């Protein structure tokens, strides 16, 4: 299971960072999910191995443009690339008409079914490998975090149950191991009932804009990776007296330490933070502030950088993408 950051800047792009977009990639390495789609996201995708034909769903955290203005272009390009499979788009209900109008007014034809789902009524979204739920956050507009949880990872046959039910070893077991339904002694046996996860499911939280990390306290229990905004450092907020509904690196780090988060990834950095350490404010100041309060595995997300979440839940940087 991987994370690939397509945009890590808050509000506006910079020369080094595009606006918000994060790819969550299945363990298989092919299918993937997109959280937020700021302007220029499809351009970022051109620098990755990801294909819009393999995109399973898009999840938008809130209505602000740096998280959604890339949608019309990405959807139109998906159609032009030959995509035909239906696509679920989970986003605030307030954006549904905007998406429809953007496509209609630009005479954009989609050769696939676009299913618009209101994030406010989502409950839980599922594919065959992942479950996605939401956590309400605190921002100037309604905002959510998306919690990705693996379903039945690396399933193995429940041999004890098979033996207990007298199901003979052989071809039947092979079919059940594939998740198929078979008939035995007048009974219909469903593969899903005889498969058990061989390891703990990995869990990842990808947050929208949020000024109160404590709202994640329940969801963050036993989470492997927390991806959270760190738009400002504390001195900037203290000097200006406003946070605009965003978090400081210190606030997120303190929460992650208290919650026992193993891997903390900070993203959504204000454009004022430069990559050049000779200039101030510099992105290194975000890292330094977080390190004071957090002793776990800290990562500052970088555009077009891929990170792998191992079977043991450890997060590591991938060389190349």
From Swiss-Prot:
User: Enzyme group, top EC level?
Assistant: hydrolase
**What does this protein's record comment on cofactor binding?**
Binds 2 Zn(2+) ions.
Q: Give the required cofactors.
A: Zn(2+)
Entry's EC annotation: 3.1.26.11
Give the binding site residues for Zn(2+) 1. 62, 64, 139, 209
Q: Does the keyword Hydrolase apply?
A: yes
- Keyword field: Endonuclease, Hydrolase, Metal-binding, Nuclease, tRNA processing, Zinc
UniProt-annotated binding residues for Zn(2+) 2: 66-67, 209, 268
Q: So where's the catalytic machinery, residue-wise?
A: 66 (proton acceptor)
User: Its catalytic activity?
Assistant: Endonucleolytic cleavage of RNA, removing extra 3' nucleotides from tRNA precursor, generating 3' termini of tRNAs. A 3'-hydroxy group is left at the tRNA terminus and a 5'-phosphoryl group is left at the trailer molecule
InterPro entries according to UniProt = Metallo-B-lactamas, RibonucZ/Hydroxyglut_hydro, RNase_Z/BN
Q: Which domain of life is it from?
A: Bacteria
What GO molecular functions are on record for this protein? 3'-tRNA processing endoribonuclease activity; zinc ion binding
- PANTHER family named among the record's database cross-references: ZINC PHOSPHODIESTERASE ELAC PROTEIN 1
Name the protein family.
Belongs to the RNase Z family.
How the protein assembles, per its UniProt entry? Homodimer.
Family annotation (HAMAP family): RNase_Z_BN
Function as written in the Swiss-Prot or TrEMBL entry: Zinc phosphodiesterase, which displays some tRNA 3'-processing endonuclease activity. Probably involved in tRNA maturation, by removing a 3'-trailer from precursor tRNA.
| Record protein name field | Ribonuclease Z
Q: Which organism is it from?
A: Pseudomonas putida (strain W619)
């Amino acid at each position: 299971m991987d994370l690939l950051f397509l945009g890590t800047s808050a509000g506006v792009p910079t020369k080094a960072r595009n606006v918000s977009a994060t790819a969550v990639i299945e363990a298989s390495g092919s299918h993937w999910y997109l959280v937020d789609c700021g302007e220029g996201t499809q351009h970022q995708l051109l620098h990755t191995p990801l294909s819009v034909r393999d995109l399973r769903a898009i999840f938008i955290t809130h209505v602000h443009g740096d998280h959604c203005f890339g949608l019309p272009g990405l959807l139109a390009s998906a159609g032009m690339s030959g995509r035909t499979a239906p696509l679920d788009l989970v986003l605030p209900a307030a954006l549904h008409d905007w998406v429809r109008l953007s496509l209609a007014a630009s005479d954009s034809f989609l050769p696939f079914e676009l299913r618009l789902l209101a994030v406010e009524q989502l409950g839980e979204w599922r594919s065959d490998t992942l479950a996605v739920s939401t956590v309400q956050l605190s921002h100037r507009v309604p905002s959510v975090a998306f919690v990705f949880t693996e379903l039945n990872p690396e399933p193995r046959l429940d041999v004890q149950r098979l033996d207990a039910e007298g199901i003979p070893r052989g071809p039947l077991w092979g079919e059940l191991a594939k998740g198929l339904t078979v008939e035995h002694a007048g009974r219909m046996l469903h593969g899903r009932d005889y498969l058990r996860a061989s390891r703990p499911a990995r869990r990842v939280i990808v947050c929208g804009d949020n000024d109160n990390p404590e709202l994640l306290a329940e969801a963050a229990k036993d989470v492997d990776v927390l991806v959270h905004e760190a738009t400002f450092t504390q001195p900037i907020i203290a000097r200006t007296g406003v946070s605009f509904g965003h978090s400081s690196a210190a606030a997120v780090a303190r929460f992650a330490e208290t919650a026992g988060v193993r891997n903390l990834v900070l993203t959504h950095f204000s454009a004022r933070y430069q990559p050049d350490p000779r200039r101030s404010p510099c992105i290194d100041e975000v890292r330094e502030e977080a390190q004071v309060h957090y002793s776990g595995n800290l990562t500052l997300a970088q555009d077009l950088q891929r990170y792998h979440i191992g079977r043991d839940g450890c997060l590591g940087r991938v060389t190349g993408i």
